Amino acid sequence: MDQRFIALLKKFNYSCDSVIFQFIRYTQPGWLFNLRPTIEEDFASCYIPEENIDPAFLDITYETHTARLADAGYRLWCKGVLLESNTNEIKNISAEKPGLQDEYIFIRKYWGNAWAYYTLLIRLFTFKNPVNEINHFFKTRYIKKIDVFDSPIMYPAYENFYSELIATTPKVAVIIPTLNRYTYLKDVLHDLEQQTYKNFEVLVFDQSDDFQPEFYTQFQLDIKITKQVEKKLWTARNNAIKSTTASYLLFFDDDSRVGSDWISEHLKCIDFFNCDISAGVSLAVTGQKISKSYAYFRWADQFDSGNAMVKRDVFKKIGLFDEQFNGMRMGDGEFAYR
């Protein structure tokens, strides 16, 4: 695991010890749901206590019982079960780690043979015992990859859920940093004009070389324009957060398109699941097929700063975006780790 990433985990009070398979660091090095906080608190996790699992759900292909439980937890997490654990619950699970054969089963089952070969090569080049590695690699060659995102857990009550949060009409601030993209921004603001939820303001931090304040007069929106001389994305977002008293902050990109229920759906999600962040996803191309893993509710394993609603209290607790990431794309990733 990258030493910078380990330092980041320690900064945020996370143990670098995985509560499931160690090999996940090769396929999902930034995935935090397999780690445990070093402080006593409840946390989102892929660990499921043994008393909460049907024995029939366990995969007996694994050699160790720990691996069977870890596999079940990972599978349920991927299918949309919102698992939570606390530090006390998982103190004892480190007694028996999944063996090397179990690790290769896990890789083949969820990522396939190509990733198994990749993992083997990494471990051989990092001076792991070649006899053990090759032996367990070939012992697991019969394992077939599964579609873990098939048959997800659904939340049917969501469709007809009456949101008291929406009924109270809290103020929402839609935050848009922009740079030389007036052509795309026109569509963005037109989409916001069509929103069914009305109590929102639009905060545009315009860093364009040819600043055009008259461009914004065509829109029927509560829109506040700030000309920012510095071309700094995370500074713009932080300045927007500091400039508003809105209870909910909705981050948007200057080249995205959304439906008319975009704001209301984010609020409804926060209300239904009693969560602090509603993390949407962004598709690179209009009309692009949505990945199976994005088609249902689950714990978010990424924070898309172009489509996410955050309670203001979150920033009060953990701070603003780190402006050291100006000029880079990982400002939202670092925020997500926190």
Where does each model-flagged region fall?
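Conserved donor NDP-sugar-binding/catalytic core segment of glycosyltransferases
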Residues: 1-24, 257-293
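A recurrent flexible, glycine/aromatic-enriched loop bordering the glycosyltransferase active site
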Residues: 14-18, 23-50, 292-310, 326-328, ...
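Acidic donor-binding loop at a coil-to-helix junction in glycosyltransferase catalytic cores
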Residues: 63-71, 328-335
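Active-site-adjacent helix/loop segment of glycosyltransferases
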Residues: 79-145
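N-proximal low-complexity "stem/linker" segments adjacent to membrane-targeting elements
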Residues: 135-191
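Acidic donor-binding segment of Leloir-type glycosyltransferases
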Residues: 189-227
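Glycine-rich, basic loop-to-helix element that forms the pyrophosphate-binding segment
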Residues: 228-244, 294-295
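Short aromatic/hydrophobic "clamp" motif used to bind/position activated sugar donors
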Residues: 249
